[in-house]
């Protein structure tokens, strides 16, 4: 299973627990975007064994997203092989520039799209996810789901249905609040000497540490001890993550201002 990194670390143990091997592509030199030529190279090097490619966008931890041209270029590569793309689009409604484009729209016969209401409606604790893809694939996923989680509780399903039917406009004020927090943090972190990209989505900043502080684990431990501020070491997100830290702006503006001080 090909996994572009840095990426949400949960994918890696899931691949391992299913007896598969993760194949990492470091995207840190490419603006944290998976490039089609690097994808093709990785597939060709493992052509007899590759079954899937993982995409997550807007991405945790970088906040980077893919536009239509990016996705079409990747789809052109994937179409050449009998493989699937597992497209985790849980942050789709938290896209700040342009409109989110789903890989399911571009590659319907080979894409399995994951989404839910956790991020779009701040319903993380309800544990309601959505999977869409080719009918035969979804049928097999249903079998696995039945014997692992059985089903989502009825009240959670009804709450998610209400959110999707009558609460789609609720995301907008939340997104506007995130953008204000993002802009505040970018300004504060830049003033502190960190290199900070402008995230296109989600609610994370993946800030590059000064070279003298390159060890992200040491940095986050020191920050927690001395400033009582918790961030995540970039090294925990796979190859290409070292030398960075992930900062969440899902916290309140008051807490972010206190942390910045």
Stretch-by-stretch model annotation:
Residues 2-261:
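PLP-dependent class I/II
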């Amino acid at each position: 299973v090909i996994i572009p990194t840095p990426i949400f670390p949960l994918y890696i143990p899931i691949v391992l627990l299913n007896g598969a091997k993760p194949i990492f592509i470091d995207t840190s030199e490419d603006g944290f975007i998976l490039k089609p030529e690097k994808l093709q190279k990785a597939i060709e090097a493992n052509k007899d064994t590759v079954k899937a490619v993982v995409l997550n966008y807007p991405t945790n931890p970088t906040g980077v997203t893919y536009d239509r041209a990016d996705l079409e270029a990747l789809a052109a590569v994937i179409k050449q092989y009998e493989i699937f793309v597992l497209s985790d689009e849980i942050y789709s409604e938290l896209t700040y520039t342009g409109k989110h484009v789903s890989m399911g729209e571009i590659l319907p016969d080979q894409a399995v799209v994951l989404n839910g209401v956790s991020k779009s409606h701040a319903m993380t604790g309800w544990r309601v996810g959505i999977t869409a893809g080719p009918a035969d694939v979804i049928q097999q996923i249903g079998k696995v789901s039945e014997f692992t989680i059985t089903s989502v509780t009825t009240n959670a399903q009804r709450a998610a249905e209400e959110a999707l039917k009558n609460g789609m406009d609720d995301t907008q004020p939340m997104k506007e609040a995130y953008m204000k927090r993002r802009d505040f943090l970018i300004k504060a972190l830049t003033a502190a000497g960190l290199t900070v990209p402008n995230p296109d989505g989600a609610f994370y900043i993946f800030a590059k540490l000064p070279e003298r502080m390159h060890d992200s684990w040491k940095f986050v431990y020191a920050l927690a001890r001395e400033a009582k501020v918790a961030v995540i070491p970039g090294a925990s997100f796979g190859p290409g993550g070292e030398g960075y830290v992930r900062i969440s702006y899902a916290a309140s503006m008051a807490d972010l201002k206190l942390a910045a001080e």
